[in-house]
Every structure is written in C-alpha cells, then in structure tokens.
Amino acid sequence: RFDRPLNVVFVASKRALNTYGDITAESAFSTATNQVRTLTGLVNQSKVWMRIEGVTPSATLVTVQMRAAVGGSDLTMANELQNRIALELTP
C-alpha cells in the first residue's frame, strides 16, 4: 500500500516492471467503488501480473504475482518488484 494517487503509482509500477523485464499488456477498469489498472509482463521468462487499485484518492494498493516458467511462484522477484516501485516513488 502506498500513500500516493493511483496514476502516480501506476507510472512507478510501469517503470519498475520495465527495469526487470517487458510489459506485455496494460488495462484499466472500475469496480463498484475503486478504479483499477493492471499490468502484465515477463521477467526472466516468468509471467508477472500487477493490480494497481486506488483505495482512496490518496492511497493505492499494489498486488504483484509471479509465476515461474516451470509453474511455481517467484516470491523473491515479486518482492523485488514491490521494493522497486517504492524506490520509483521516492523523490
């Protein structure tokens, strides 16, 4: 969770994913209460899914999931992407 608006965190998430791999798709939609953006990509042949959800006008929740090419999750790289997003948000 980041105390920044959705658009700012979305741009930081794109930069973080581009640092380690490639973005393959992005989308935006609204739920009943929140605006949501998603990113999908590849990092070291692992699939990445990011959900960036504005929970309030000034707070955003980011969920990162990674699946390795052999099927297991890659928690280390998912955590590294979360940390990179935080670094991208640092002034």
Label the model's feature ranges.
Residues 1-91:
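Ser/Thr-rich, low-complexity intrinsically disordered terminal regions
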